[in-house]
Amino acid sequence: MLNTNVFCRPFDDLSDPLVKKEAIFAGKILEIAENKEIEILTSDILYGELSLISDQRKRDIIFNEIENVSQRKIKISDEVHNLAADLTGLVGDYSDSLHISFAAISNCDCLITCDRHLIKIKYKIESFLISKGLELAILTPEEFAESFD
């Protein structure tokens, strides 16, 4: 599962070297997905965040890319809500907790994100999920894309 920021990264300020690098790897992941080498799941939170993009053209381009690579859309459930509520104290942001919960509950291998805070606390998140009987790796676009080289 891809966090919203991975889909958006190619449209961000690429003058920042880290953002540019993330955009390149995000593009590689989307290419891998378009070639059907991986399965991309989407979620209600992804589409909810997408609706917040004020630039209509950017939103339409990202929406089309999501629709192009998505294999299946995961709907919100009580299980997702409950896990997100439990995670929010650790993560600090309910939307991020929802992304993690959707990915974990739907048995994704990983959540790919450019969110520096989530990357910083990824081992805490992964340990918390293990304590709940769930497994999910939190990866940067680079970490994921390099596993295909």
Question: Each PLM stretch: what is its role?
Answer:
Residues 1-42, 52-60, 125-128:
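Short, well-structured N-terminal submotif of metal-dependent ribonuclease cores
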Residues 6-7, 46-48, 117-119, 144:
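Short, solvent-exposed loop/turn segments at secondary-structure junctions
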Residues 13-23, 106, 110-149:
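Acidic, PIN/NYN-like endoribonuclease modules and their adjacent C-terminal/linker elements
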Residues 16-17, 49, 68, 85-88:
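Short, contiguous strand/loop micro-motifs
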Residues 34, 67, 104:
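Anion (oxyanion) recognition and catalysis
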Residues 38, 42, 46, 54, ...:
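Anionic, Ser/Thr-rich low-complexity intrinsically disordered regions
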Residues 49-53, 82-86, 147-149:
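Short, solvent-exposed polar/charged micro-motifs at secondary-structure junctions
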Residues 71-112, 116-120:
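Active-site neighborhoods of divalent-metal-dependent phosphate/nucleic-acid chemistry enzymes
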